[in-house]
Amino acid sequence: MVQIINKESNDRSKKPDVEYKVRELFDLDVAMTVPGFSKKDEYVPIIDDSYIFDKETTLSILAGFKYNRRVMIQGYHGTGKSTHIEQVAARLNWRCIRVNLDSHVSRIDLIGKDAIVIEKGVQITKFKEGIIPWSLLNGTALVFDEYDAG
């Protein structure tokens, strides 16, 4: 099941507000800047200072952030694909949410649903967005983990 997102937790811009130099942030010999955020929040992964970046994979992930493109990383189970994305996001202060695409995730979790809510003392039906629309609206990197799972 996908965890319900606290929609009120929004004390930062929804769009990147700084440019980071890849050479300085990742110690890679490239003249490239990547958009990021000046502030962290609860959805920004924690930085692992001991993490070792693979240059080609890192540049692919950074290109995705820079050009707002999807990036697919594939490899054997347990080789650190999702962690690599999270560690890049952590250094850019990008929100990053990992969604395990196992049998417990439904279309409703991903897209959203109509829900009965109380507003101003009146019961109404209101659309509650799932993880995909929420992420699109809130500047969040989504990692679909185990997309090929049964």
Language-model-derived ranges and their functions:
Residues 1-150:
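AAA+ P-loop NTPase catalytic core and its hallmark functional loops
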